[in-house]
Amino acid sequence: MIFPSPLTEARLIRRYKRFLADVVLADGTELTVSVPNTGSMLGLTAPGSRVLLSKWDDPKRKYPYRLEIVEADGTLVGINTGLPNRLAAEAIRARLVGDLGTYPVIRPEQRYGERSRIDFLLEHPERPPAYVEVKNVHFMREAGLAEFPDTRTDRGARHLDELAAMRRAGNRAVMIYVVQRADCSRFRLCADLDASYAAAFGRARDAGVEAFVIGCQISADAIAPDRLIDLDF
């Protein structure tokens, strides 16, 4: 995924109200920018952190700048939770994710389960449909180890239970985690931060739900899925 225009460098002053952050540009201008991430962004909100912003050329937008990338410990980390679906689709089409790239039809945002939408429904004329859920990952406490979630997510646990139900019904069900940082080679669940999610993942795996973790290269120009990361359980 290539950013449509060059990103603007700034320094983080603070993040607040989940969706907002104050930053200062290189020329000293202070701005309030939107934050496309409802999670805690644990470890990524230190004042003074280098950040990269995209800009919308829309005079109707209250906040024309949007936070896209935070630098943490010398590594660029993508925080936009609207991008993982796009990155997962790129990885699937590039045949990085098992045999999912052999499904000729990829339908985004399809209704299923109880009041939910699946991120992708993959269809093949000779195979059961594949229900694919995608989650964003940017949390790292131990060098090289990506973790999810960084806060409690009851919605995420429900999605795993619904994937398990789809698998028991004879469909294929797949959980994809997209790690928006290049310094991780392993992945595990944060059972200490959300035991319920870890338990739901165990139930899903027992039901036959597949799991893949996609790693990405991050730069000021693009975010590119380029490899699978090992699950460390």
Curated annotation (Swiss-Prot):
The lineage of its organism: Bacteria, Pseudomonadati, Pseudomonadota, Alphaproteobacteria, Hyphomicrobiales. Gene3D superfamilies: 2.40.50.580, 3.40.1350.60. InterPro entries: SfsA, SfsA_C, SfsA_N. Belongs to the SfsA family. It holds the Pfam family SfsA. PANTHER family: SUGAR FERMENTATION STIMULATION PROTEIN A. It comes from the Bacteria. GO terms for molecular function: DNA binding. This is Sugar fermentation stimulation protein homolog. The gene is sfsA. It comes from Chelativorans sp. (strain BNC1).
